Amino acid sequence: MTGFFSKYSRFGETSEVASDLERLNFRYRHVIERNQNLLAGKTVLDIASHDGRFTFAALRGAGAKFVVGIEARASLVEKVKKTFTEYEVAAATYQFITGDVFEEVAKIERGTIDTALVLGFLYHTARQYELISSLSRIGVMNIIVDSNVIKTDKPYILLKVEGTQNDSQIWDATRPKVLSSIPSALALELLLQEFGYSTTRIEPEGDIPSSAKDYERKARVTIVGIKN
């Protein structure tokens, strides 16, 4: 098996969430490599950075200048630190913040972030509008979204109740279940457009491994929003 994450196989062990290396390699090609122009030499914000897989990919693979990762679960941040030490990532090129995404984004100084990675997050929140508004407010020019979606051609967001106990679920410090939602692809596009981002859907190319067939089924989409 070849691919970016095959060279850094620790990421197949630091999380049980979508950590199949074939899927990670596909997502690297599809999300990171195809948007390298929005990452190379940029300061990047990684929303819900999990075990640091795409923070690392942005730095080591795409050539980002600096990446800030925000992750609510301290146990995952501890794993990131060990992984980055093992792979000798320069400490001056990244920062991980343990905290609530919405609270921490609000603290970021305007104009300090070029590109935001919002990967695997917008179907674990009922606050999509608020997040994109906050990213726009702090001056983020490029937003790369990768999300599960409901399959409809309407701009719908489906509310749901989601557990909070597993790393694959929405985070909440005090409640075992909270309100969450899953958007449609068109809803995501309209949310980005509302704040002045022109949108492009990134369609999957090449061989899609069995562990990433959700992209082929259009149950998951990648959308890039850019402000000119």
Please give the residue ranges for each predicted region.
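Class I SAM-dependent methyltransferase SAM/SAH-binding core
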Residues: 65-92
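Short alpha-helix
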Residues: 178-196
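Conserved class I S-adenosyl-L-methionine
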Residues: 42-50, 145-168
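Conserved alpha-helix/loop element of class I SAM-dependent methyltransferases that forms part
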Residues: 22-40, 57
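A short glycine-rich, Lys/Arg-flanked "PGG" loop and its adjoining helix->strand segment in the class I
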Residues: 129-142, 149
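A short SAM/SAH-binding and catalytic strip from SAM-dependent methyltransferases
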Residues: 115-127
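Conserved SAM-binding loop of SAM-dependent methyltransferases across substrates and taxa
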Residues: 51-63
